[in-house]
UniProtKB/Swiss-Prot annotation:
<dbReference type="Pfam" id="PF01964">
    <property type="entry name" value="ThiC_Rad_SAM"/>
</dbReference>
<feature type="binding site">
    <location>
        <position position="232"/>
    </location>
    <ligand>
        <name>substrate</name>
    </ligand>
</feature>
<dbReference type="GO" id="GO:0005829">
    <property type="term" value="C:cytosol"/>
</dbReference>
<feature type="binding site">
    <location>
        <position position="544"/>
    </location>
    <ligand>
        <name>[4Fe-4S] cluster</name>
    </ligand>
</feature>
<dbReference type="GO" id="GO:0008270">
    <property type="term" value="F:zinc ion binding"/>
</dbReference>
<keyword id="KW-0949">S-adenosyl-L-methionine</keyword>
<keyword id="KW-0479">Metal-binding</keyword>
<feature type="binding site">
    <location>
        <position position="465"/>
    </location>
    <ligand>
        <name>Zn(2+)</name>
    </ligand>
</feature>
<comment type="function">
    <text>Catalyzes the synthesis of the hydroxymethylpyrimidine phosphate (HMP-P) moiety of thiamine from aminoimidazole ribotide (AIR) in a radical S-adenosyl-L-methionine (SAM)-dependent reaction.</text>
</comment>
<feature type="binding site">
    <location>
        <begin position="317"/>
        <end position="319"/>
    </location>
    <ligand>
        <name>substrate</name>
    </ligand>
</feature>
<comment type="similarity">
    <text>Belongs to the ThiC family.</text>
</comment>
<dbReference type="GO" id="GO:0051539">
    <property type="term" value="F:4 iron, 4 sulfur cluster binding"/>
</dbReference>
<dbReference type="InterPro" id="IPR002817">
    <property type="entry name" value="ThiC/BzaA/B"/>
</dbReference>
<feature type="binding site">
    <location>
        <begin position="358"/>
        <end position="361"/>
    </location>
    <ligand>
        <name>substrate</name>
    </ligand>
</feature>
<dbReference type="GO" id="GO:0016830">
    <property type="term" value="F:carbon-carbon lyase activity"/>
</dbReference>
<feature type="binding site">
    <location>
        <position position="397"/>
    </location>
    <ligand>
        <name>substrate</name>
    </ligand>
</feature>
<feature type="binding site">
    <location>
        <position position="203"/>
    </location>
    <ligand>
        <name>substrate</name>
    </ligand>
</feature>
Amino acid sequence: MEQRIKFPRSEKVYLSGKLFPEIRVGMRKVEQVPSTTFEGEKKVITPNPHVYIYDTSGPFSDPDIEIDLKKGLPRLREEWILNRGDVEQLPEISSEYGRMRRDDGSLDHLRFEHIALPYRAKAGRHITQMAYAKQGIVTPEMEYVAIRENMNCEELGIETHITPEFVRQEIAEGRAVLPANINHPEAEPMIIGRNFLVKINTNIGNSATTSSIDEEVEKAMWSCKWGGDTLMDLSTGENIHETREWIIRNCPVPVGTVPIYQALEKVNGKVEDLTWELYRDTLIEQCEQGVDYFTIHAGIRRHNVHLAEKRLCGIVSRGGSIMSKWCLVHDRESFLYEHFDDICDILAQYDVAVSLGDGLRPGSTHDANDEAQFAELDTMGELVVRAWEKNVQAFIEGPGHVPMHKIRENMERQIEKCHNAPFYTLGPLVTDIAPGYDHITSAIGAAQIGWLGTAMLCYVTPKEHLALPDKEDVRVGVITYKIAAHAADLAKGHPGAQVRDNALSKARYEFRWKDQFDLSLDPERAFSYFHAGRHTDGEYCTMCGPNFCAMRLSRDLKKTQKQK
C-alpha cells in the first residue's frame, strides 16, 4: 500500500497561529509557471502567483514526516487537550466488549499494536468545544479552523468574516460543529457549518461479503487524498472493532460511525435482541477508540413508523429500518429516544458530536417531502436542543431522493425546525432513473442544497444502490462531490473561493497546460485525457484543433487590437 500522497508541482506548507503560535495549519501550495507575452518582437515574462489549496491529506503529503501505518499518525492535538487540564487518562478500557476483544488472543494478527489508554473528562468538567465556546474560550482548534478556512486570504488582500472569535460564536450558538474526540488527537481540526466552506463526507466500510482491513485503510487514505473532509466507517462485516482502530489511528480527518450497526452485529443480526445496555457499551467502546461523531436514529418514534407505509419505497435507511422494526416488535418507544439524554451524557465526556440520523428519509423522488420525513424532522428539532443543553455538538442528517423543485423546502424547514443546526445531506438525488450514474444525479441536488445552506454533503459513488464501492469508486465519488461543494462555495461567496477558478481560467486562456492540470481537482485524470490526445503543449487541444480554437483566436484578436 502506498503510504505517501503526492501532487504534481505542489508543496506542503504551514501557516502559524497568532493566538496560539505553536499551531501549524497544513495546506497545499501550487506554483504556477510564468505567463509569456510579446510586445512587438520583445518577449515579456510575467510571474503568476502561487495558489493555496485546502488540504485534507494530513501528514501523508508531508515528506518530512515519517509514516508508519503500524504506529499511526502523529498525535497532533494531544498536547492541546492535556494543557486544558480537564481530562484524565483511564487505567483501562471502560467497555466490556472492548476488553473482551483486547483479551482475545486469536485476534492478535489483526490488532493495531500501539493502542494508548483512552482519555475521559474529569468529574464535573465540561470538555466539549461547545462548552468552551459558551464560556467565551477560543481553543487552539478554533483558531486552527479559522486559519484553514481562510488559507492565504490575508496575503491576497481578500476580506474575510472568519476569525477565531467568529468560529467560537458559531459553535456556541450551535450553527457549526467542530468534531474532535479527545481520543482522536491525530485528526486535524475542521468545521461544519453553513457560514464556512461546504464539506463532504466519504463513506467506507466492509460488509459481510467483501473487503479487508487493509482495503478499508487504503480507501480512507484515498479519500483524504482527493479531498474528503470527514470519513464514515459503515462496516457491517467481521472484525468491526479492529478495522475501526486501524482507520482512526491513521486518519487525519474526523471519523464517524453508526453504532447501531455494530450493536446489531453483536446480537447476530436479531433486531429484537437489541438492548439499551448493549448499545450503551457500544457507544463507550467507540468513544474510547476515538470516533468523532455518531449517526444516531433517535428521531424514529413509535407513533410515526406507520407513516412510511404509504410510500413507494418504504424505509430505506438501514438504521431507520432497524429501529422501526425494534419499535414494532416491542410495541414501545425506541431506546435511542428514551435514553437520548443518557447518550448525550456519554458523548459529552469525550467530545463526540451527534449526527441525528434521518431514518425516515425518502428513498425515491416519489416519497420526497412526505409526512413521515417531516415528522422525524420535527423530533430532530427537539433532540438537537436537548443535545445542546448537555454541551454536545449536533447536526442534522437529511435526504435522500428529492426532485429539484422540492429541495428548497427541505432547507427552509430544517432551518426553522432545527434552530439553524448544521444540515448534512445525502445528495439529494434528483432523479431515480440512473443506476451507475447516481454520483451525478446526486451531485446536481448536492450543489443546489449546498448553495441554499447545507453544511456538509455525503458523497455518492457510481455504485450507489448496486455494490460496495472500491478504491476507484471512492475517487470518483469524492471528486464529484468536491465539484458540488465548490460550486456551492462560489455561489455563497465564500472568501477566496474564486481564486483557484480564476487562476485555472487564466492558465487555460494562456495555454499553460501544466498549470491547468496542477490546479484541477484531479490532476492525474486531466493529464491522462490530455496525453491521450497525442499532441504536445501547443496552443490548442484535439477538441478544436489549431484553426477552430476560440481562445487562440481571441488572443490573436487582442494582439491585433493592441498593435493598432
